[in-house]
Amino acid sequence: MRLIFLGPPGAGKGTQAKLLTERYGIPQLSTGDMLRTAVAQATEVGKRAKAVMDAGQLVSDEIVNEIVSDRIDSADCARGFILDGYPRTVPQAVALDRMLEEKGLKLDAVIELKVDEAALVRRMENRVTETVAAGGTVRSDDNPEAFRRRLQEYREKTAPLSEHYARTGRLKTVDGMADVHTVTAEIEKILA
């Protein structure tokens, strides 16, 4: 089973990916984790990524695509995987399609968690309040202004992926505003 989750920050993609990872025994592939691992292991592509990051630049699609390709080739991905944070743009999605085709693989589903943005901001504010009340540390980008910037960036760069996958007939949508278990049940219906 090979899946992609789409949706804005705070929609519950990570929560759902974790639940499905546990249920189906397939890895959740996070772009950030893959990048850090490649750099730590000093792979050829990891060295190139490190040089770019050390120069304070953004890692190119070419490097990210190569890291994803290498990770998909890992033994633990033989039964499938859930992509988290990739693809972020239509060019990355096109590269992923090409990459999977070359490997004789295909995506089983692209699942978009549809959510109300105003409710997402309230969710984030509640999470901050609960974290502070519990004596925890709040992320620096967990404030309404930063969160709205992340939502805007999502709308501009990542939301067009929905149209891309809808055109190819692979996009399935789920109401991400429901409770966690209801969302999981809806996703499992899609995967059945």
Swiss-Prot record:
One of its GO terms (cellular component) is cytoplasm. It holds the Pfam family ADK. Consists of three domains, a large central CORE domain and two small peripheral domains, NMPbind and LID, which undergo movements during catalysis. The LID domain closes over the site of phosphoryl transfer upon ATP binding. Assembling and dissambling the active center during each catalytic cycle provides an effective means to prevent ATP hydrolysis. It is an enzyme of class 2 (transferase). Monomer. HAMAP family: Adenylate_kinase_Adk. The keyword Phosphoprotein does not apply. Keywords: ATP-binding, Cytoplasm, Kinase, Nucleotide biosynthesis, Nucleotide-binding, Transferase. Pathway: Purine metabolism; AMP biosynthesis via salvage pathway; AMP from ADP: step 1/1. Its EC number is 2.7.4.3. This is Adenylate kinase. One of its GO terms (molecular function) is adenylate kinase activity.
